[in-house]
Amino acid sequence: MDDNRKKALTAALSQIERQFGKGAVMRMGEQPREIIPSVSTGSLGLDIALGIGGLPYGRIVEIYGPESSGKTTLTLQVIAEAQRQGKTCAFVDAEHALDPIYAEKLGVNIDQLLVSQPDTGEQALEIADMLVRSGAVDVIIIDSVAALTPKAEIEGEMGDSHVGLQARLMSQALRKLTGSVKQANCLMIFINQIRMKIGVMFGSPETTTGGNALKFYASVRLDIRRVGSVKEGEEVVGNETRVKVVKNKVSPPFKQADFQIMYGRGIYRTGEIIDLGVKEGFVDKSGAWYSYKGDKIGQGKANSSRYLEEHPEIAVEIETAIREKLMPKTPVKEKEAPVAPVEAE
């Protein structure tokens, strides 16, 4: 860069610093390279598919899928994992359908969980905005976008046409929220439902509610589906679930994870550790018997999983080995490097 352009840049940077404060503009290379903080989803396979070990703090996430596919269960597992990290969590229940007994079974500390059941979409998003701006809440769930009914629609009569009201509401709210979420390092998860587009000849007719704004503002989008049933004899005891990472701004996208959600228990984590352990060679399988480091841990997956539940230190050991093998190496956090503003020369 020649001297005249360098002087012009220096003058501009000095003016920006005076007007907007120190650190308003920085050279990217002078910032410390930090590992993106994340919270586990409760599923080992999904944590690996997401690339950073879970859902990222300081970002907006969308989880969508058909009815009874496990959307709320997955978010409650995220809350349980975040609470184990000592985080504060809030649940904005626009559907008025949160079951505290089920949440407690999944490991959620309901005494520490903040819950709101707002009357209108505007109220729900305003409450979420105030919680984010407080800087004291780490995880906020909004269940669901489809239930964020605009005030005009609630006060109107049945059958009244309110074209695009919800989409405009979401677009305006996300413009306000996205910066606050980053500054507060808060994870905001929107649960969404699926609708069908009429007259689609080619491609998928499915779309999500609330317009296109959330598709753009979300750093991670997860498509969750029930692909089968888990049976014990003739009794159905859970769902076979598949989650596709359809958008990911923090790691390579388009990966998927398969796991089981057991009724009344949530994600079948030990079963997942057994399956991935066998696949990656950490757990040996001979016929129906499973063994780890030469010691038999059980006959059949159910007995082996029960053994891991009774010996959590072995489950943690296998899980750590799987994560170290499958998770990409992340850059080491440079603690000494300060966030330096561009200085005038």
From Swiss-Prot:
GO terms for biological process: DNA recombination; DNA repair; SOS response. PROSITE patterns: RECA_1, RECA_2, RECA_3. Keywords: ATP-binding, Cytoplasm, DNA damage, DNA recombination, DNA repair, DNA-binding, Nucleotide-binding, SOS response. Its main location: cytoplasm. It is found in: Cytoplasm. It comes from the Bacteria. This is Protein RecA. It comes from Hahella chejuensis (strain KCTC 2396).
